[in-house]
Amino acid sequence: MSESPVSLSSLTAGDKATVSQIDLPPADRPRLMEMGLLVGTPIELIRFAPMGDPVEIKVRGYNLSLRRHEAEKILVAPS
């Protein structure tokens, strides 16, 4: 049985998950899609910056930094 989706920002360093939903405004979604962050994409949370913002994730073989407010709107299914 798979776990319920949680926000990307609630993961801890080293956690792996799969993107299940992106609840950002339509104007912000194309930028993430261009960087390869799509529903169904596996990700790994690498680290939070010292003050908690930004959040660094590994997606499709490269590291990507997101603002914490963006990470809070991305729902993932933990692996």
Segments from the language model and where they lie:
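Compact, glycine-rich, soluble single-domain proteins
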Residues: 1-79
